[in-house]
Amino acid sequence: HLTELRVRGDAARAQVLQFHNGGKFVDGTAMKRFSLTHESCRTGVSETRDSRQDVILTMFGEMLETVTANEPTPILTSKLPDCHYKRHLEANSVVMFSLVPIRNASGMSVIGCLSMEWCSWMKADAVVEEDIIPMMKEKRRYIEAELASQTT
């Protein structure tokens, strides 16, 4: 599903990031983290999986805000405030991205997100928002079903 999404959206990358716990702070509270678990990249585009493993979620607050907005509207990286997430995207040559939450089987909890990234202004300029939004939502349903089947 990721490769089909990436190709149909003419993106550089399509990814699944999943939220999890890992470790504890000094006061005993669990550290919320995320890891990139699945990635499809256009030929010649570098994978980012290694740099997105076991990442502390609070370092990516702007990403989390975008995910919880629940609408996969493409966003220009340059429109983000100066933050760790923006620097991370820029370091990976991302000029535009789209995020949509992935929910658990009951639909109550956000367990991760589906991401598309464009690394070329020419590709980003050609994106039609009205095409990307339903495409992301459709693929999210397949991915949610697949992840739910893995936990049962």
Predicted regions and their residues:
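Juxtadomain coupling helices with adjacent low-complexity linkers
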Residues: V110-T152
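Intrinsically disordered, low-complexity terminal regulatory regions
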Residues: H1-V45, M136-T152
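Conserved beta-strand segments of the P-loop GTPase G domain that flank and frequently precede/overlap
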Residues: L76, L99, E117
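Helix-to-coil/beta transition segments that act as allosteric "coupling" elements at the rims
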Residues: P81-S109
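Regulatory sensory and allosteric helical modules in signal-transduction proteins
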Residues: K32-N92
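Generic "edge-of-domain/loop-turn" microfeature
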Residues: G23, T43, N104-G107, W121-K123
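General structural signal for secondary-structure boundaries
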Residues: H1, R52-L57, P81, M122-E130
